[in-house]
Amino acid sequence: MKVAVLGAGAWGTALAGHLAARHDTVLWARDATLISELSTSHENARYLAGVALPSTLRFQANLELALNHALDDAALCVVATPVAGLRAMLRTMRDMRKVPSHIVWLCKGFEADSQLMPHQVVAQELSGHTSNGPLSGPSFAREVGQGLPVALTVASASAACRERTVAAFHHGAMRIYSGDDVVGVEVGGAVKNVLAIATGIADGLGLGLNARAALITRGLAEMSRLGAALGGRAETFTGLTGLGDLILTATGDLSRNRTVGMQLASGRSLDDILNALGHVAEGVRCARSVLSLAQSHAIDMPITQAVCDVLFNGVAPRDAVSALLRRDAKPE
């Protein structure tokens, strides 16, 4: 199978390496210098240092040529840009008249200005295109790059998209499950990043494992309430892309969002943390959107509110935790 992966960050690089073990795979990045480095060393020293990439993986700085690789009906295009870059990528595909038949995206979050989910952005930019959907689940790029076991879910209304994605990714140490609850998968992937900041704050304050468990459990309730209001199915939020991804992101040392929370608890400013991180922390980008959507649907999300207070409203992490603890008792 021919596969084009668009975006050579850590996640795009790791998945391109996995795909190249079985398929004719091209990895695209707009940075020609990065492509030159990748072609020379077969290692992404910027974003996934220390992980050797297969010699069969090819690299491309020309987007048109990369898209040509995925135009065949039997091919697959994997969009590995952040949410903030998704619309521009789709628009470029459309304007070039190089829209692949089957598209999956890896980003998690909501578009900041519109508060749209990724699939809604796709519907706006690629009207009439149906063989598409998110590939999501509990996964750290470094572990995937190292060939460690992982399970992901592809969600699409299109059976062809689901089948094509499973055929591409389901080999080696990677298991792919499939379903059609696109909304549930995308809500889970967005909200878990915000909740991971909360658990990072609690861990950074030394509040203990009991507090972490409470935040994860009550956070899952917030995720489920918002997801149901937006049209997701309840069972999705106890699956890989809901509870599974939440557990990993809220507890794993490789989690950028948890790291942000821990650093906030230590007293560092958000700007300093993000500058030092050097990578996207989607929980910071989409926290306001999650809270705004919750408020517009009259959904109570106190943990999300606390995270937004710390990130954007000048509330000290310990004061935000104290406010949560002062909330009135209520039935579970």
UniProtKB/Swiss-Prot annotation:
Annotated HAMAP family: NAD_Glyc3P_dehydrog (MF_00394)
Subcellular location field: Cytoplasm
Catalytic activity: sn-glycerol 3-phosphate + NAD(+) = dihydroxyacetone phosphate + NADH + H(+); sn-glycerol 3-phosphate + NADP(+) = dihydroxyacetone phosphate + NADPH + H(+)
PROSITE patterns tied to this protein: NAD_G3PDH
Family annotation (InterPro entries): 6-PGluconate_DH-like_C_sf (IPR008927), 6PGD_dom2 (IPR013328), G3P_DH_NAD-dep (IPR006168), G3P_DH_NAD-dep_C (IPR006109), G3P_DH_NAD-dep_N (IPR011128), NAD(P)-bd_dom_sf (IPR036291)
Pathway: Membrane lipid metabolism; glycerophospholipid metabolism
Gene Ontology annotations for the cellular component aspect, listed alphabetically: cytosol
Residues given in the record as sn-glycerol 3-phosphate binding sites: K108, G137, S139, K192, D245, S255, R256, N257
Positions that bind NADPH: W11, R30, K108, A141, R256, V280, E282
Enzyme Commission number(s): 1.1.1.94
Coiled coil: none
Keyword Ubl conjugation carried by entry: no
Function: Catalyzes the reduction of the glycolytic intermediate dihydroxyacetone phosphate (DHAP) to sn-glycerol 3-phosphate (G3P), the key precursor for phospholipid synthesis.
Domain of life: Bacteria
GO molecular function: glycerol-3-phosphate dehydrogenase [NAD(P)+] activity; NAD binding
Source organism of the structure: Paraburkholderia phymatum (strain DSM 17167 / CIP 108236 / LMG 21445 / STM815)
Enzyme class name: oxidoreductase
Family: Belongs to the NAD-dependent glycerol-3-phosphate dehydrogenase family.
GO annotation terms (biological process): carbohydrate metabolic process; glycerol-3-phosphate biosynthetic process; glycerol-3-phosphate catabolic process; glycerophospholipid metabolic process; phospholipid biosynthetic process
Annotated protein name in UniProt: Glycerol-3-phosphate dehydrogenase [NAD(P)+]
